[in-house]
């Protein structure tokens, strides 16, 4: 049974492509006709491609891996954020950080900085700083959160990218291609589908079009997550789950309170120095 259908896609306006003069010839296999100078996408092919992508996404979710959703265009940002959150997946809806994938360790370092700042807030270190210093660090935290907050739980490279408008997000696509990360993409008639592993031919400018496609794909991912959870419960019931190993004792001696306060103060000073140099 299909994840979506012709009528649903038609009602959402998924069939509207771009002006003929803006088309990319590589999208010819997915174009049904031209009407009033505008290309019309073959929605029968869109249905098939949505099903293909949804099944692959389901298997990724079932395996416990992450899919990174990318959409920085205004029409898609909010809906992508909502759908990604519904399946507990990371997403980028602000500016794509250059090197997000190809220089992932640096991005992780910035994410960890947010966690460190949060710790300074909770452990009382802030009380030893001036209002100006607290404001500087808080601004750093807000700036980091805006661009990286939605990927805070991404501890390793994603197993796939789901991109809205592959032409606008060309840097993200290139980074994924370079690392061999599969790319799922909603591809309009003005875009090049060549480097997209799972092409979903559809209108990528209308919010409703993006929403109905994400609905189908995320529903499949939810199924995958539920199947993973059910299999885990069955394994535990059958006694096949690996025994919980005791936590390894840390080789480092525990820091006493004064040492920890000194380290946190040093971290706060480092953040302030970075802010002044920026």
Protein language model annotation of sequence segments:
Residues 1-3, 226-278:
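Intrinsically disordered, compositionally biased charged tails
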Residues 1-233:
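Ribosome large-subunit tunnel/peptidyl-transferase-proximal elements
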